Amino acid sequence: MLNTLQANGELNATHIDQMARQIADFHLQAPRVPMEHPLGTPDSVMAPVEQNFEQIRPFLSDKVDLQQLDALQAWARSSFERLQGCWKSARPMASSVSATVTFTWQRHLDRWQGSDFRLHRVQRAFPTDRRLRRHGLPGHGPGRPWLKCLARRFISQYLELTGDYEGLELLNFYKAYRALVRAKVALFSMPADADGVQRATTLRTYRNYANLAESYSAIPSRLLAITHGVSAVGKSHVAMRLVEALGAVRVRSDVERKRLFGEQQQADAGQLSTGIYDQDASAATYLRLHEIAATVLRAGFPVVLDATYLKREQRQAAAEVASQTGVPFLILDCHAPEAVIASWLEQRQAENSDPSDATLEVIKAQQASREALDAQELVHSTRVDTQAAGSMDQVIEQIRQRLPGL
């Protein structure tokens, strides 16, 4: 089981990717319920949130704890009002979810079998399904940074599979709600005749979860990064490093292109400028990338756009999104020796699991037609030698120094 893998330090990216696909497939196939359903109203979203505060408050006597709870309640109410448009436009899905395995990222992985959860509001499946609200709670504490990396990877992979980037605006609201549910459960578990030691232990657990909820109400640090380089140079790996290390959301051009236009026809296979890769399709794909980037940034998350960005006008359009949203802009200028690119391409084609259709001929054409970064772009760029293990470590450290909140 997953909790055993986690306890043994064996839980890895493959497990997370598989879980993301299983849950994404479930949500995409789940039946929908009508908007007029009693559980489909905004008020039904807020009722259990308010209930948390009402049930927690009688257990607290410390002034600092009470002040924190009041601040969290005020934030929850203001967030609920700010997100009114999201509640009304979100697509409702199944109102009952049978969960056989669910994650929690605070301290460990919990396994729930045969549990039938009645959802208070089944909005966009991503933030409101109870399983995913648990997924959103990253591992904190010494010796567990890899759990946070895996939680971030799950979020990005799930979004990539479903395309439900608009649901991100609801994520921190629900993460805070779920953290306070865990805080409440800790208080409920305290015996009525608890001694001083038991009460102190319970309050310590409560405060850990309350602090976790508070962290989700903080003003976020955001960033818009784009990759720049030919196919098979390692851009997707570079982008995923930003996901795991900084909590960015990766948006892949290959995925969004096919979400828009479907698969390339066999007759056009290997062609650089026909079918779903013609000029109009490429322009629409980059436009969609930039729309998603704006959505992710509005939700308070950093974003990395995983595309070739070989043309200057494409990069300028991305820079404009960063300017309009008031966030730093970074170009990850990806390089690798030609022999390395060729070997990675061969491996990718053999595995047949990547959405890219690029061939060696396509890559050579890209190398010949790419527009080099100009002087102004170089100011916002950093070189990444993708074959060098430590290159991205340096980039991530530079970003953290510039944006300590990440």
Give residue ranges: language-model regions:
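Conserved lysine of the Walker
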Residues: 235
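Small-molecule kinase domains that catalyze NTP-dependent phosphoryl transfer to phosphate-bearing small molecules
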Residues: 347-396, 406
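ATP-dependent phospho-/nucleotidyl transfer catalytic cores
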Residues: 2-105, 109-223
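Conserved phosphate-donor/acceptor-positioning beta-strand/loop module used by diverse small-molecule
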Residues: 325-345
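Hydrophobic positions on the alpha1 helix immediately C-terminal to the Walker A/P-loop
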Residues: 238
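The conserved Walker
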Residues: 231
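Conserved substrate/cofactor phosphate-moiety recognition/catalytic segment
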Residues: 243-301, 343
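Hydrophobic anchor at the beta1->P-loop junction of P-loop NTPases
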Residues: 227
